[in-house]
């Protein structure tokens, strides 16, 4: 079982570091970045649309005042004093309207740039999504191949577990369920599962007269396989 555990651990490590997995994760990060950029452009467009609405409303108000004063000036029904008051006011409305129209043209130019950027981001996201789906399919194929390699080892493990005494099978299965190695060959002063160094005090607690005791390393919890020479 220790040998099977080692092999299954190598297979799991391979699954975690597949080039197909790295490619998929990279594309996923790029897709997330593209989504963030899209949201930023959409927010900027909303702000620009608000500016356009306000400018157009103010321009319309200036135009109405300009039209009103023009009618009065052209009506001939105003006296000299009214005429002298209306002419500067009329010029003020014209200058203000012209200034607002210049601002509106600048904002509309900015809006066009943002709209082009939005179109580009949407196209990029569509391409990224297609690539991401393809990368996911490639990764799933790689996972399936690894599962196929690991299945015989897992099946053999199940057979061996069924033959173990509960004192061994219970802690072994509990450790495996947590993602760790359940058993390992003690290698010198190192845990056979996690490869951590075991202190001399802990090693000295393993005595020759406890042949039937299940020896576990406290840090990893893994069952330790001991060579006969360990007790000599």
UniProtKB/Swiss-Prot annotation:
Top-level taxon of origin: Bacteria
Annotated coiled-coil segments of the chain: 89-140
InterPro entries registered for this protein in UniProt: CT398_CC_hairpin
Keyword Coiled coil assigned: yes
Keywords recorded for this protein, A-Z: Coiled coil
Name assigned to this protein: Uncharacterized protein ML1638
Protein source organism: Mycobacterium leprae (strain TN)
